[in-house]
């Protein structure tokens, strides 16, 4: 029997404005289109994908806590909170679920304050700069990681 992995995709602040917000940086796809693509990819990867977006740091912390016992892993675009939130970092460390950090833009080619990630030290990996494919590759990497853990 094949395991169907349960994956939570979390989107941080301002990502609800995708498609309108700075399309030269973030692309023209809406968050709904990204979520639909990830759910579709999930079918092929034998992963059940759930998504959640919030502009509130506290709601994202609560979602991470709620993932414990309900999901096998997290794909997380913490957006601006990547660079500022110790609370999100600590929540991820507390639940100890494998997490892949993703970003639509290459945070390392942008302003220097964006080069710092508080999420990366508690994530299994980081993918950035590939637009929608950052999410898609992040989901695939997480499922590959989970499959590897199940095999060992």
UniProtKB/Swiss-Prot annotation:
Its EC number is 4.2.1.10. InterPro entries: DHquinase_II, DHquinase_II_CS, DHquinase_II_sf. Disulfide bonds: none annotated. Pathway: Metabolic intermediate biosynthesis; chorismate biosynthesis; chorismate from D-erythrose 4-phosphate and phosphoenolpyruvate: step 3/7. One of its GO terms (molecular function) is 3-dehydroquinate dehydratase activity. It is an enzyme of class 4 (lyase). GO terms for biological process: amino acid biosynthetic process; aromatic amino acid family biosynthetic process; chorismate biosynthetic process; quinate catabolic process. Coiled coil: none annotated. Pfam families: DHquinase_II (PF01220). It comes from the Bacteria. Keywords: Amino-acid biosynthesis, Aromatic amino acid biosynthesis, Lyase. The record marks 21 as: Transition state stabilizer. It catalyses: 3-dehydroquinate = 3-dehydroshikimate + H2O. The active site is at residues 26, 103. PANTHER family: CATABOLIC 3-DEHYDROQUINASE. Homododecamer. HAMAP family: AroQ. Catalyzes a trans-dehydration via an enolate intermediate. Belongs to the type-II 3-dehydroquinase family. This is 3-dehydroquinate dehydratase. It comes from Synechocystis sp. (strain ATCC 27184 / PCC 6803 / Kazusa).
């Amino acid at each position: 029997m094949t395991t169907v992995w349960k994956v939570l995709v979390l989107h941080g602040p301002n990502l609800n404005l995708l498609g309108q917000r700075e399309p030269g940086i973030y692309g023209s796809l809406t968050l709904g289109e990204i979520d639909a693509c990830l759910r579709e990819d999930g079918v092929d990867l034998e992963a059940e994908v759930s998504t959640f977006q919030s502009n509130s740091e506290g709601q994202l912390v609560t979602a991470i806590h709620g993932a414990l016992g309900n999901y096998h892993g997290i794909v997380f675009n913490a957006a601006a909170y990547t660079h500022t939130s110790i609370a999100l970092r600590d929540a991820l460390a507390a639940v100890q679920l494998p997490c892949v950090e993703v970003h639509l833009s290459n945070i390392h080619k942008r302003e220097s304050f964006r080069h710092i990630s508080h999420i990366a030290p508690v994530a299994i990996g980081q993918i950035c700069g590939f637009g929608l494919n950052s999410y898609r590759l992040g989901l695939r990497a997480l499922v590959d990681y989970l499959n590897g853990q199940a095999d060992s």
